[in-house]
């Protein structure tokens, strides 16, 4: 879990666009965040396995 201060810092509007970065909305992880869902790959996988993301199912070919 990220510190509360880091979550607040990431939520602020950056002075320069290159300083802005995404954080997971659930756990606060700064890396491997899926922009479409705004959550990290770990939380995405967990929610997908639990069936909490509508329209998403495991690929099989």
UniProtKB/Swiss-Prot annotation:
Entry GO MF terms: rRNA binding; structural constituent of ribosome; zinc ion binding
GO cellular component, as recorded: cytoplasm; small ribosomal subunit
Cofactor note: Binds 1 zinc ion per subunit.
Binding site for Zn(2+): 24, 27, 40, 43
Single GO BP term: translation
InterPro entries: Ribosomal_uS14 (IPR001209), Ribosomal_uS14_bact (IPR023053), Ribosomal_uS14_CS (IPR018271), Ribosomal_uS14_sf (IPR043140)
Cofactor(s) listed: Zn(2+)
Key words of the record: Metal-binding, Ribonucleoprotein, Ribosomal protein, RNA-binding, rRNA-binding, Zinc
One Pfam family hit: Ribosomal_S14
Task of the protein: Binds 16S rRNA, required for the assembly of 30S particles and may also be responsible for determining the conformation of the 16S rRNA at the A site.
Classification via HAMAP family: Ribosomal_uS14_2_B
Membership in a protein family: Belongs to the universal ribosomal protein uS14 family. Zinc-binding uS14 subfamily.
Subunit comment: Part of the 30S ribosomal subunit. Contacts proteins S3 and S10.
Protein name per its UniProtKB record: Small ribosomal subunit protein uS14
Species of origin: Mycoplasmopsis pulmonis (strain UAB CTIP)
Taxonomic lineage: Bacteria, Bacillati, Mycoplasmatota, Mycoplasmoidales, Metamycoplasmataceae
């Amino acid at each position: 879990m990220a510190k509360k201060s880091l979550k607040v810092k990431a939520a602020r509007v950056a002075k320069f666009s290159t300083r802005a970065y995404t954080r997971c909305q659930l756990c606060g992880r700064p890396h491997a965040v899926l922009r479409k869902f705004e959550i990290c790959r770990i939380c995405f996988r967990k929610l997908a396995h639990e069936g909490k993301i509508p329209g998403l199912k495991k690929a099989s070919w």
